[in-house]
Amino acid sequence: MRLISAKKFAKDGKIRFKEFYRNNIPSYAILSHTWEDGEEVTFEDCKPPVAKDKKGYKKIQNTCRLAIGDGIDYVWIDTCCIDKSSSAELTEAINSMYQWYQQAKVCYAYLSDFQGGNLKDCRWFSRGWTLQELIAPKIVQFFDRSWKNAGDKMSLLKQLSAVTNIDAGILSHQVPLSSACVAKRFSWAAKRRTTRDEDLAYCLLGIFNINMPMLYGEGRKAFTRLQEEIIRTTNDLSIFAWTWRGSWDGRPYLSFLAEGPDDFTWCSNLTLRTDPLVNEYEMAITNKGIHMQGPHWVSEYKDGAIRYSLSLQCANKDEPHRPILIPMRKAGPNIFMRAAKSGRMDVSLGITSSYPINSKSFTLLTRLPREQLTSGSLVSIFRHVAVAVEFPSDVPKLGVHGIPQKHWDVEDAVFFGPDSAVRRWGCVRPSGMGGEMLVCFWHKSNNDWEFQGTILNSSEEGMDGLMQDLFVFAEALDYPAEVVEGVLRRHGVRVGQKSLQVRYGGKKFRVAFTVERVNDRKICFGPHFKIKVSRLPID
């Protein structure tokens, strides 16, 4: 750490540095301020007479004067104590910045545009770097444009909390910073700005106790990297609680990672419902996106829509019993995109009922493929072949269960698969009917696709073993289609059966299905079979 000798500076106005290392760093004062373009004294400017010609020289003068008055021999100022021509030194400094402010004996916050009035109008509260400079040090003394004392952090605590939306307990160090969920911490940086896009991420490293290399030139990718590093260190799902704040361009789906702190503006009142260390989720960054272990949900909305959703294990502190869920769109085998609606995320609003899907794992996409397609939709390009199943209108949509779950999309009520010669299968069983169940097979043959369906009654005597084989073993062990067909035959099922009689509510019905080849690029990019199941009473 490179420090300025305050006493030597006071004697002759020359900036002299002394380097210290972790075990022998003396007490020091630290300056927090907003930079003036071209007027700050940099490390290269410290040799006279260049330094004295810049306005920033007075900041060094006053910081040293205040430090000497407080009995402190050394000061640290970000403009001149870092050799920014050295990328290694700059990286070390930025990664250490929070700790340096935290360990300072006192922090002098110079508000260059404050001369009485309302603190919230000061530029200091709108800059990215000053966020950690307010939180990290225990003692912060504020000075107006004339370097007159304007109060300290404790005397201004209530006002500072109101201006920044940061809990007073965190500002006063009575409550640990880690007690605030990830989304809440991001919300403190909302509407703050930095000169360079990358610094919107780099200025938050200390807030999340993260270290990562500096890559100036990467632009907003820095904020993506920051979120990925946070995910590597915590299971706090509130990181997905952001809402889209950019210009709405009609995109129906988004990445699961936010584009910047502004997306977290609404999250200042969020609180965790469970400790991330003991919640039922695990997250890992992969080359596809975020690999999740834990449940996700199927939710029904007031408008009748069925959507997948992810519970974020957090809630608004004013509604602690209402968990926040975000809608998802299934794009591939247990692969999800984030669904958007009318330019903002639908966070549990309008949900009437939900049930969990306890899949082994699923993936949240952090990068989407081509956003503009000449035909079809972003969903359909993941599906080369689809089998849609339509049941009578009185069958509740939320009660239709399909396996394998990874190839069944509840929202569209379709099985989907890739362009492959491998034979595929799917089994769908609705609640609210007479026990009927549809098993489907499809495969590519001679450059075309063939479909075969079998309808059976799962409530018949002796079917318990079949149900276990299909809904437990076939699902868990990922049976291929040939094995599933063998299971059906072993249990006496006539493969290819297209109709049967069932008893439901004391009446007899004939249940049958029809197969139609359709073309719907919104559902599927390739072959699309539409299966319509009918149920007619038998007199």
Q: Language-model segments: what does each one mean?
A:
Residues L3-K11, S27, T34-V50, D70, ...:
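Long, low-complexity, serine/threonine/proline-rich intrinsically disordered regulatory regions
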Residues R16-N24, T63-L66:
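Short amphipathic alpha-helices and their capping/turn segments at secondary-structure boundaries
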Residues R16-Y21, S86-E89, A109-R123, R192:
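Intrinsically disordered, low-complexity acidic/Ser/Thr-rich segments used as protein-protein interaction/activation
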Residues Y21-S27, W100-Q103, R123-W124:
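Extracellular/periplasmic catalytic domains that process cell-envelope and extracellular macromolecules
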Residues L31, A67-S87, Y101, C107-D113, ...:
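Short acidic catalytic loops
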Residues S32, Q61-G69, N95-Y98, Q102, ...:
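Amphipathic alpha-helical interaction motifs in eukaryotic regulatory proteins
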Residues E39-S96:
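General structural concept
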Residues G56, L90-A93, M97-W100, R127, ...:
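Alpha-helical interaction elements in eukaryotic regulators
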